[in-house]
């Protein structure tokens, strides 16, 4: 990581260097997901050998990471609030019989970034623009009129590539503030004997989530200091032409950020609105790593 802080001019230069606006036409709303072709999806299905299913998600419940202590200001996100609308007790008492059916029902109230999730292309803006040059005012109190995450519902399928950077560096977890470099990513792929291909979904393990789980506390995880992608890995994203990138940290990129005051999450500024790449955050990778 460079000792010099990334400034506004660096951000302008990066926006110009990595811009994909118009690459898939003026009306595109899914960005780098376009790198994955139907042929790629068919090829990916042929890689299945055991049929074992591994979830990479945390449970959506009160034990999640949001709301834990952090040295940075809160983003206002909370863990899911679960409310029962009908229960087995209601059924047993007979109060449901007037409806002619005994059943349980419930509801969940939560921020959409409360746990394991994908950042949509309407999430982060570069100045007053989102992906493909759409005006940020397309996101209103009624929701995202452009680049909503729902646009990806029939697109997010492809070959997954797991890069265990923590294991490559011979540690249980990368240190907070460690910026993962291009060399780390390519070195991990080489050690694992993986050839990265256009349209891949790359999942990177830092070990941070497991560190928190082992300690029995999420304090410092949501919005705190963390290992993550250094700003230089924008080259990796560009050169590999990957479809999407995910990690086991709260915000993917290294924290504290490499930028000067007033530029929060600079890697996000470029990957989402400029390059059109959705990213996955808070992925639970322990079972996959084992």
Language-model features: where?
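Active-/binding-site microenvironments in catalytic and ligand-binding cores
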Residues: 1-290
